[in-house]
Structures are given as structure tokens and as C-alpha cells.
Amino acid sequence: MALRLLKLAATSASARVVAAGAQRVRGVHSSVQCKLRYGMWHFLLGDKASKRLTERSRVITVDGNICTGKGKLAKEIAEKLGFKHFPEAGIHYPDSTTGDGKPLAADYNGNCSLEKFYDDPRSNDGNSYRLQSWLYSSRLLQYSDALEHLLTTGQGVVLERSIFSDFVFLEAMYNQGFIRKQCVDHYNEVKSVTICDYLPPHLVIYIDVPVPEVQRRIQKKGDPHEMKITSAYLQDIENAYKKTFLPEMSEKCEVLQYSAREAQDSKKAVEDIEYLKFDKGPWLKQDNRTLYHLRLLVQDKFEVLNYTSIPIFLPEVTIGAHQTDRVLHQFRELPGRKYSPGYNTEVGDKWIWLK
């Protein structure tokens, strides 16, 4: 079985079918940020990024291991700075941001399960890599939504993790023997042709919580699936953060690190942010022209996801054409998923002929 986020139609349906190899799926995701498409004439007539971007127009990501308090800190920072908070993108991110907001069946969401990964990370049906591949695509969509919001409104954004830190889970999975080397190669190929078009965050905040404390928090939380996570897996995640992610990001953006105790004080974090100079990274080299092209990219979800589908056969994420067509047909039969919002009579849309 395989996962792929493919072809986007002009609908705002949140489906993205399990597919791979030759699979292309319509009716996936449309932006919730801006209904009127931005284009060349807007730019020529004066709608340029420099008119709305200010020193508060920042992209901040909050990173850390599992159960380190990322969500709480990210939300509080966003509230104090007046930024928009983007909770961590999960399997159902497309469902939560489009359509009626309700989660769809696994067939329309990568045919993967986080709970199954925790219960049986070495499952021979390929669930572990399907999950990781799907989550990368979900983070890619979310990051494009966040950048679109920033460029459209000028309001800063705060995310929990991003496409730039997603690889830490891949490395941990591989080190623990959950996925094959071919899966790592496939992931890196997809990442290399997708992430290159995106600017990194202005700031990365890393919450450093020791593995024993992470495990204690997981046990206290009481999720029966998460409680099966091994200390070795958590340690590999931490190692990937500290040995690869943080050194790489420190060359591209500002980095702040906090202990578990320090992360409880969001007021102090905001003060630290306001003292930063933000004097490094590719954002400094951008002008109206480059930001215009970036905005065109992030509003086009077809283009955002286009290169997540590459012609490489990988059993974990590949299904046949007949199954792809079957799942797509089933999706189009769901209430409100056949046409664009406002044009589906089966969900009560009226006066369609006047629209």
C-alpha cells in the first residue's frame, strides 16, 4: 500500500488518497487562508509584500521531543505576540482545515495510523513509513498555509514543528530498524525537491527535556499507545535534534533553547524574542519580486504537493491504479466533496445557478 498526496482539484475537499508511484489524486486541499487567488495583476497594481510585512511578520517554530510542552508554549507565545498559532499538523490536518472539519477514514488519509505505529512499529505492512511520509506532506501543507497567511496578512505565525524538523523522526525510525534504507532514500528524494522552495523560520525554539522526564510525562499522560514508546526511540529523536537539526538551523535562523522548567515561562520567552536582532538567514535577501513568487507557490496547493509524488516504486507507499481510482471515486461520493464549497446540493447548498 502506498501513500501519496497528489493532484489537487479546484475543490476544497480535504481528501488525499493513499497512493504512490503513478498515483495522482484530485480533490485534496485548498487554502483556508485566501479565497481570491493572488496573481500578476495584483502585483503590478501595487499589492506587494513590503506594504504589509513588518518587524512582527515572523515565522516561529517550537520544536522538541514528544510530550515536552510545545503546544502550550507555542500557543502562549502566539497570544502574547499577536501571532497566529498553528497546532501541530497530524494525519488529519487536511480534514481539519477544509470541508466540514471532520476526520475522514484512513483510506483518504494515507492509510496509516499513529496508534498502530506505537503498538507495532515494525509492522510488515509498511505502516511506519507510510505514516512518516504522510506526516511530512501534512507538514508541507501546513507550512505553505502558514507562509500564505504571513504573506497575505502580514501577521506572524507560530508552528509546532515544521518540514525542517520532520526528519528527526525518520532518523529515529531508521536507527531503530522500523523502516528500510530504501524508505530513507525515498524520503530524502521527496524532501530535496520540495523543501528547497521554502524559506526557513525566522526563529526556532527548542525545548530540551531529558528522555527520562519525557517518559515520565508520557506515563502521566496515560495514553496506552504512547506508553509503548521506547527510551531508545526517544533518545534517537533527541540526538537528531541536537546533532543535526539545531546546528543546521543555527546557520539559517535564530535559535533559542529552553529547559523543561524555562519553557513554562512564556513571558520570558517573549522577552527573549523581542531582544533578538534577526540579522541572519535568507529572509534578509528577499524583496517584493521573490516574495511574489513565494506567495504564488504557497497559494497553489497542487504545486505545493506536486513533487511529493515521484516515480519510484516503493512497496510501503505504492498501490495500483485500479485501487487509486476506486478510492478516488468513493471520496467523490462523500457529501459535499464532489464540487467546490457552495455547489453541492446534497449538503443543502442553494441558488447554485446564481453563483
From Swiss-Prot:
Keyword Glycoprotein: no
CC cofactor note: Binds 1 FAD per subunit.
Ligase listed as a keyword: no
Gene Ontology biological process terms in this record: mitochondrial electron transport, NADH to ubiquinone
Transit peptide: 1-35
Location in or out of the cell: Mitochondrion matrix
Cellular-component GO terms for this entry: cytoplasm; mitochondrial matrix; respiratory chain complex I
PTM annotation (N6-succinyllysine): residues: K285
Protein name in the entry: NADH dehydrogenase [ubiquinone] 1 alpha subcomplex subunit 10, mitochondrial
Provenance organism: Pan troglodytes (Chimpanzee)
